[in-house]
Amino acid sequence: MSQQLPDVQATEPDVSVGLSEVGVTGVEKLVEIAREDDRPIVLMAEFEVYVDLPRGRKGIDMSRNMRVIDETLEDAVREPIYRVEEMCGEVAERLLEKHDYTTTATVEMNAELMLREETPASDLPTQGTIDIIASATAQEDAPTREEIGARVVGMTVCPCSQQMMSETARRKLAELGVGEDAVREFLRDVPQAGHSQRGHATLTVEAGGDPDVNLMDLVSVARDSMSARIYNTAKRPDEDHMTYESHANAKFVEDCVRSMARGVVEEFDHLPEDAVVTMKQSNDESIHQHNAHAERVAEFGQLREEVGSGE
């Protein structure tokens, strides 16, 4: 009879320090999001799955734990999925049940979603991608918290450089004898040049249980927080539209985050006060080697109070 191998992971570690997260990353699964009266959306999703580890245990049984994780994910993705954050919550809760030495389980999911839409001026069919972000954390004796959100790309224009160009245009028009009222009307109707950036907006909402927000509504708030939306396919009228819209709506990186805050408050006024909203904006500078970044993390109640006080 073969001798059973020792369970090394269950032994005492050399250093008795607990770990907040131990697990696996880069777990790829096909996920189908069910839709009523339509074909499901198929995602190639990548998961990160973690549990906490008490100070008296050396490891988490990585190989066996991976099998548990894989089986749990497979069970979850076989069932009809309407909200990916709910799926993450279910997986986290199952993992917590199957690990008697852990008190917290976290599941994070990232996936790329292809959007079909039309260009703004010529109505050409076009496609673009967004990154879906979903996660959940299950804890003993506490409601599971779920998060849903997206990373999107858009365009921004710097108000400062635009203002300098407007002043240059104002002086030149005055030198040419154009009246002050005509100059003012021209500058109002024809936004002046400013250096542009490709903007990256991230917007997520986390709440106890289901955040109860529509993913595509979150995407719209994030895209509209920048100076203009962008499109992969574009005829000249579409290029003109994007250029005009972005310059007529010039924004600093800080403005984009504040626009997201206002959009969340207006679009999701049903959210609980303790829902956590994360808003990030990163702009790829066109005239500098560095980039610009701004962000805010706040509970919805605080965000609503701040947005309301500014009206």
Swiss-Prot record:
EC id: 3.5.4.39
Cofactor note: Binds 1 Fe(2+) ion per subunit.
Annotated Pfam families: GCHY-1 (PF02649)
Pathway: Cofactor biosynthesis; 5,6,7,8-tetrahydromethanopterin biosynthesis
GO biological process annotation, one example: tetrahydromethanopterin biosynthetic process
Example of a GO MF term: GTP cyclohydrolase I activity
InterPro entries per UniProt: GTP_cyclohydrolase_FolE2/MptA, GTP_cyclohydrolase_MptA
Reaction(s) the record says it catalyses: GTP + H2O = 7,8-dihydroneopterin 2',3'-cyclic phosphate + formate + diphosphate + H(+)
Keyword line: Hydrolase, Iron, Metal-binding
Statement: the UniProt record of this protein carries the keyword Hydrolase: yes
Site (May be catalytically important): C158
Chain's role: Converts GTP to 7,8-dihydro-D-neopterin 2',3'-cyclic phosphate, the first intermediate in the biosynthesis of coenzyme methanopterin.
Family: Belongs to the GTP cyclohydrolase IV family.
Cited NCBIfam families: GTP cyclohydrolase MptA (TIGR00294)
Quaternary assembly: Homodimer.
Name assigned to this protein: GTP cyclohydrolase MptA
Gene that specifies this protein: mptA
